Amino acid sequence: MSFKDLHIISMKSFSRDMIDHVLNTAEMLEPIAKGKTKSDLLKGKILGVLFFEPSTRTRMSFETAMMRLGGDVLSLGSVDASSIAKGETLADTIRVVNGYANAIVLRHNKEGAAQLASEFSSVPILNAGDGAGHHPTQTFLDLYTIRRESHLDGLKIALAGDLKYGRTVHSLCYALSLYGAEITLVSPKELRLPADIIEDLRSRNIKLTEIEYIEDAIENVDVLYVTRIQKERFPDPAEYRKVANSLLISPELLEKAKPELKVMHPLPRTNEIDPRVDNTKHACYFKQSFYGVPIRMALLALVMGALE
């Protein structure tokens, strides 16, 4: 199974066998991610980092992943200090960076930007989030977290929060459909999962339930995946204010959950998870954040042909 020169744009491109291969590779590389051993697997390779939106975990974990494997990182830095501020197109920027890097990780505010970039790129494009579209590398780390901390086959999971604009949820739904998951969607009506995604999931014969209140699902799920309300994607601030405080995960709520329930969150969080949850056995989101390093190590090594 070869991933060499493969663009990582959407989870729709991956079979279960391909996903499992990435997860297995990440598990093999995890000791390197923890700094227990060193690696020169990507020595002499350069990762181009183009972020048109803010990021902490995705950007730093990609850069850490590249450096843990002995490679180098070439970062765009501030968009305002680049030729993009002069009107350079994304296509031209990608063509230019092709001459400098062996792969490009791209985050952009416009849905479809990663696909567009891949059409002009001679090196692999790794989509680190395209507007409200997809975030496949986050999904890989989410699946890895679930496998390490719970189980994938026959999983019962609740996805709660902003399901309309939350790109991590969009990608995760597609992947979970390959594992026969039972998915409960928890959100206000204004933030429902887009109809086209729901229709697609139902066509895959996945068990899907939509509810408005997490209290109606908390007792029965293995994993609770929480997302923040994506304030920056609301065209109308008044609409954001209507739903801003629609979800709160508290220790009191979790008393009703299974003892083995894991609470996940792609972060950053705002006020949807009470900080007191951090000290419970259910909190899994900081482990989840770390798992981004071995997963992105695996993806980088695979698309650059250092591993098969």
UniProtKB/Swiss-Prot annotation:
Pathway note: Pyrimidine metabolism; UMP biosynthesis via de novo pathway; (S)-dihydroorotate from bicarbonate: step 2/3
Keyword hit for Cell division: no
Residues bound to carbamoyl phosphate: R57, T58, R107, H135, Q138, L267, P268
Binding site residues for L-aspartate: K86, R167, R228
Stored InterPro entries: Asp/Orn_carbamoyltranf_P-bd (IPR006132), Asp/Orn_carbamoylTrfase (IPR006130), Asp/Orn_carbamoylTrfase_sf (IPR036901), Asp_carbamoyltransf (IPR002082), Asp_carbamoyltransf_Asp/Orn-bd (IPR006131)
Coiled-coil parts of chain: none
Keywords from the named record: Pyrimidine biosynthesis, Transferase
EC number(s) on file: 2.1.3.2
Tree of life domain: Archaea
SUPFAM superfamilies found in the cross-reference section: Aspartate/ornithine carbamoyltransferase (SSF53671)
N-terminal signal peptide: none
Pfam families: OTCace, OTCace_N
Gene3D superfamilies on file: Aspartate/ornithine carbamoyltransferase (3.40.50.1370)
GO biological process: 'de novo' pyrimidine nucleobase biosynthetic process; 'de novo' UMP biosynthetic process; amino acid metabolic process
Catalysis performed (reactions): carbamoyl phosphate + L-aspartate = N-carbamoyl-L-aspartate + phosphate + H(+)
Entry's Gene Ontology molecular function annotations: amino acid binding; aspartate carbamoyltransferase activity
Transmembrane segment boundaries: none
One GO CC annotation: cytosol
Job description of the protein: Catalyzes the condensation of carbamoyl phosphate and aspartate to form carbamoyl aspartate and inorganic phosphate, the committed step in the de novo pyrimidine nucleotide biosynthesis pathway.
HAMAP family, A to Z: Asp_carb_tr (MF_00001)
Family according to the record: Belongs to the aspartate/ornithine carbamoyltransferase superfamily. ATCase family.
Name this polypeptide is given: Aspartate carbamoyltransferase catalytic subunit
Protein encoded by which gene: pyrB
